[in-house]
Amino acid sequence: MEISPYCLLSLLPIFLLSGFSLSYDEFDGHAATSRALLQTRTTCKEDFANKNYTIITSRCKGPNYPANVCCSAFKDFACPFAEVLNDEKNDCASTMFSYINLYGRYPPGIFANMCKEGKEGLDCTDVTQSASATSDSIPRASTTASLAVLSTFLVLCLLFLSS
């Protein structure tokens, strides 16, 4: 039994459009730690989806993840956003960590367990305004767009091979 290329071609729009409705952190559980039961957090005004995470990912590399290098890179990235990250009324911290883990594929809790400087958290007084605060985005191919191009190419190949 042979599958018609036209059948595959008719399924292409379904696959292409299904990726547009899901976001990366839609399936992440965002636990409300140290919050009142009915207190809601506001959406973060900072656009962490388009920040330049190469500040962290180019310096903090496994498998050993050296604490001094990783914590320094993390501070260089996060300190310019310290005010919004420390505000417990928004979801900026959880959003930022979701993207750090997405782009860097770090073990869960690596920065929280490794980077400790005192009771008040990390000291950002010695960190200068870094590129993360000034350059909002780096060019990244969207996963959905990449899948769309790839699946279109495969369907076209099947059409040409079957004719």
From Swiss-Prot:
GO cellular component: plasma membrane; pollen tube; side of membrane
Positions glycosylated per UniProt: N52
Lipidation (GPI-anchor amidated serine): S135
Keyword terms of this UniProt record: Cell membrane, Glycoprotein, GPI-anchor, Lipoprotein, Membrane, Signal
Domain of life according to the entry: Eukaryota
Propeptide stretches in the record: 136-163
Phenotype of gene-disrupted mutants: No aborted seed phenotype and normal production of seed sets.
Species in which this protein is naturally found: Arabidopsis thaliana
Keyword set includes Cell membrane: yes
Name of the featured protein: GPI-anchored protein LLG2
Entry membrane topology: Lipid-anchor; GPI-anchor
Tissues where the protein occurs: Expressed in pollen, pollen tubes, sporophytic pistil tissues, in the early stages of female gametophyte development, and in unfertilized, mature ovules.
GO biological process, one term: negative regulation of reactive oxygen species biosynthetic process
Subcellular location: Cell membrane
Residues in the signal sequence: 1-23
